[in-house]
UniProtKB/Swiss-Prot annotation:
This is Amino-acid acetyltransferase. It is found in: Cytoplasm. It comes from Pseudomonas fluorescens (strain SBW25). The lineage of its organism: Bacteria, Pseudomonadati, Pseudomonadota, Gammaproteobacteria, Pseudomonadales. Keywords: Acyltransferase, Amino-acid biosynthesis, Arginine biosynthesis, Cytoplasm, Transferase. GO terms for molecular function: L-glutamate N-acetyltransferase activity. GO terms for biological process: L-arginine biosynthetic process. It catalyses: L-glutamate + acetyl-CoA = N-acetyl-L-glutamate + CoA + H(+). Signal peptide: none annotated. PANTHER family: AMINO-ACID ACETYLTRANSFERASE (PTHR30602), AMINO-ACID ACETYLTRANSFERASE NAGS1, CHLOROPLASTIC-RELATED (PTHR30602:SF12). CDD domains: AAK_NAGS-ABP, NAT_SF. Residues 287-426 form the N-acetyltransferase domain. It is an enzyme of class 2 (transferase).
Amino acid sequence: MPEYVNWLRHASPYINAHRDCTFVVMLPGDGVEHPNFGNIVHDLVLLHSLGVRLVLVHGSRPQIEVRLEARGLTPTYHEGMRITDAATLECVIDAVGHLRIAIEARLSMDMASSPMQGSRLRVTSGNFVTARPIGVLEGVDYHHTGEVRRVDRKGINRLLDERSIVLLSPLGYSPTGEIFNLACEDVATRAAIDLGADKLLLFGADLGLIDENGRLVRELRPQQVPAHLQRLGSSNYQAELLDAAAEACRGGVGRSHIVSYAEDGALLTELFTRDGGGTLVAQEQFELVREAAIEDVGGLLDLISPLEEQGILVRRSREVLEREIEQFSVVEREGMIIACAALYQIADSDAGELACLAVNPEYRHGARGDVLLERIQTRARAQGLKTLFVLTTRTAHWFRERGFVPSSVDRLPSARASLYNYQRNSKIFEKAL
């Protein structure tokens, strides 16, 4: 089977889920200048064609720096924010205006020689952002640097209903006609919150949030963000993106994502695959450990059948699983059962058997087996069981490392010993609870 067929089948639930959803996408000025910008535009057009309501927010920092240098002006910052005097504001307006027009032109192109050839869409920009001055902080006058006061929710939603892509620039206007230089991260975050967006997507140079060991952090909850901000420091752009992502979630946005503008296809990978390719920040749990329900039988069969074929697990038919479903605990991720374990109380004894412990091969890098083991042990104690047995042919060392000790058929309660399969010759371990 062609690989794209399998990919499309796996992506189809996400295509349906994203249709008619509102996504706010923030692309910094560095991302617009990057060679991958053309691919990002193609991907945005694809999202639009799939029914996603798109608000695109662009930055302009490097473009402003170029204009300041051309005029012999020195950029001035305080606490990471640009101080925008009158001369700097002229550079800001020039940079933002040119960039907005360039982005509109790119989105207006016929996507010749691309999957989106023939796509026609409308891009709309305007005075959707009302701003106010930051003013004087710690004795420093920020002049024309401002912050978002409100976003024209009704006006933007009306355009989204009409199938326009709304383009927001990092400029805001006051009711008295003043112009303020804004941070694109602030514009995107406030737009996502005020619009009640389903997602805020933030582009950065890296794949996402990188931890102290150089590894990608794939998932975070807002409560975990402060520790990373402290590690990164206030001058780190990753910290700015992470702070914006967490603020959006606290403001009611369903999910925030940090992805790379340098990685071709990063946006689509993040949105249409189960594990994504960037960093996800969300209030809800990404994985749920729970007791199994009858609706999980199909997912359990998908999980354990390959292990049964290899002789690692004892075969269980659909009928058996349906009958014994209440014995199972599962780990669910994005609607997919990725791990399971079962607890059987052994008749006429105070012992139980841990059985059918299985983890999807793609998710064995985590501690999901340990999580399920703890879950089963907690259930066993709640049932008043004193001993937990396990029979295994392949994972003896794993259980020994977790406190199980070698046992024998003679140690099994008679109700279980009479069912022991000598041909399978499983090793027996037990653990006092």
